Amino acid sequence: MTSNNSNQPITYPIFTVRWLSVHALGVPSVFFLGAIAAMQFIQR
């Protein structure tokens, strides 16, 4: 995180496979945890 242009290739932003994997796993997991936590309170 010190120098952004030292060990990365020429046109390769951080907005790629790593970003997609983090959000493809993080966003649904947070959604499902919220849904499961909400289900705990609506038991008849």
Swiss-Prot record:
Subcellular location field: Cellular thylakoid membrane
Predominant subcellular localization, coarse grouping: membrane
Family of this protein: Belongs to the PsbE/PsbF family.
Subunit-structure text: Heterodimer of an alpha subunit and a beta subunit. PSII is composed of 1 copy each of membrane proteins PsbA, PsbB, PsbC, PsbD, PsbE, PsbF, PsbH, PsbI, PsbJ, PsbK, PsbL, PsbM, PsbT, PsbX, PsbY, PsbZ, Psb30/Ycf12, peripheral proteins PsbO, CyanoQ (PsbQ), PsbU, PsbV and a large number of cofactors. It forms dimeric complexes.
GO biological process: photosynthetic electron transport chain
Binding residues annotated for heme, in chain numbering: H23
Keyword Iron: yes
Keywords on record: Electron transport, Heme, Iron, Membrane, Metal-binding, Photosynthesis, Photosystem II, Thylakoid, Transmembrane, Transmembrane helix, Transport
Membrane topology term: Single-pass membrane protein
NCBIfam families in UniProt: cyt_b559_beta
Domain of life: Bacteria
Membrane-crossing segments per the record: 19-35
PROSITE patterns: CYTOCHROME_B559 (PS00537)
InterPro entries: PSII_cyt_b559_bsu, PSII_cyt_b559_CS, PSII_cyt_b559_N
Pfam families, per database record: Cytochrom_B559 (PF00283)
Function: This b-type cytochrome is tightly associated with the reaction center of photosystem II (PSII). PSII is a light-driven water:plastoquinone oxidoreductase that uses light energy to abstract electrons from H(2)O, generating O(2) and a proton gradient subsequently used for ATP formation. It consists of a core antenna complex that captures photons, and an electron transfer chain that converts photonic excitation into a charge separation.
Cellular compartments per GO CC: photosystem II reaction center; plasma membrane-derived thylakoid membrane
Cofactor: heme b
Protein name: Cytochrome b559 subunit beta
Gene Ontology terms for molecular function: electron transfer activity; heme binding; iron ion binding
Cofactor binding: number and manner: With its partner (PsbE) binds heme. PSII binds additional chlorophylls, carotenoids and specific lipids.
